[in-house]
């Protein structure tokens, strides 16, 4: 049986069953080398359903599947990365998820920049919105995506750049869900 047929059959099952949704997710992991775009598009459905059923059913298995679904997309999807890296953070210390509604447009613009759909991105927002922290998340995401490539940063303040550098190192070393 071809992988695409396997995926189709997996998604025809009762996906409110944790085992069935897990099988559907596993089929997407098999599909990824053959059809990357379809695998990651369908994974958004797995993530939506696993979040819904985790809440409705109070299911730990669905909750964990939601985490695995985020991890599957995190190297390629900045929004998924931002949610995944804070998975184990104490809710009161989370940055992205509580502000996601406001920062999602900026995260999508940063995604477009990383995907070479934009040559330049200028972000102008009021102080305290979260530009710097989101930029730190972006730098760590880029560093993880392309560890062999350098990242150049500039600022009016050497102390600010030193702080950004140290925070990036902290994020890279201590963010392991």
Segments from the language model and where they lie:
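N-terminal accessory segments
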Residues: 1-118
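A structural signal for short coil/turn segments at secondary-structure junctions
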Residues: 117, 146-147
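Walker A/P-loop NTP-binding motif
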Residues: 136-145
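Alpha-helical scaffold elements adjacent to nucleotide-binding pockets in ATP/GTP-utilizing enzyme cores
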Residues: 138, 163-171
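Conserved Walker A/P-loop ATP-binding site and its immediately adjacent core
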Residues: 153-166
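Conserved small/polar residues in nucleotide/adenosyl-binding loops
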Residues: 174-177
């Amino acid at each position: 049986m071809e992988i695409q047929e396997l995926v189709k059959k997996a998604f025809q099952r009762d996906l409110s069953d944790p085992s069935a949704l897990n099988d559907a997710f596993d089929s997407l992991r098999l599909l990824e080398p053959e059809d990357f775009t379809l695998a990651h598009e369908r994974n958004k459905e797995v993530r939506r359903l696993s979040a819904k059923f985790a809440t409705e059913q109070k299911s730990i298995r669905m909750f964990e599947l939601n985490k695995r679904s985020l991890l599957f997309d995190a190297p390629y999807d900045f929004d998924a990365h931002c949610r995944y890296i804070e998975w184990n953070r104490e809710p009161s210390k989370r940055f992205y998820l509580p502000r996601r509604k406001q920062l999602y447009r900026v995260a999508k613009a940063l995604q477009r920049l990383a995907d070479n759909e934009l040559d330049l991105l200028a972000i102008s927002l009021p102080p305290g919105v979260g530009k710097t922290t989101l930029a730190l998340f972006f730098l760590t995401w880029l560093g993880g995506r392309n560890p062999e490539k350098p990242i150049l940063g500039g600022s009016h303040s050497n102390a600010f750049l030193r702080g950004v550098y140290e925070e990036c190192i902290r994020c890279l070393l201590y963010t392991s869900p």
